[in-house]
Amino acid sequence: ARITAVRLVAELGDLRRFSTSAQIDAFVGIDPGRYQSGEKDSSLGITKHGNHIARKILYRVITQMETVKATQPCHITDYYDKKKRSSNRQGYKKIAIASVHKLIRTMFALIKHDQLYDYNVATENKRL
């Protein structure tokens, strides 16, 4: 886990340089793509523009969190499990990317407010 954290910091740099978590999403390449032509407007999958290494690390973090959820509870794995149970049509990769987005928002909020992660606070505060 420490090696993963070091690799992630090496790829993302200081998260304080971003104004919003959406900017981090775009930097990593998990922001939603859009197609517009005339009056047609459709949403695509993720853009994949950005740091592909950071995107892979974050994806692997979600899978690692899933394996240790029994001993180390996290609101992100709770979210992943809830989405997995409620959606028969959505694939696990889409759910994992949604969880990556939630992880980015959580990391950004914790760094912005200079706080440590607390599972009890995270489950009370649904925005994290």
Spans of model-derived segments:
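Low-complexity, acidic/Ser/Thr- and charged residue-rich accessory regions of DNA metabolism proteins
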Residues: 39-40, 77-128
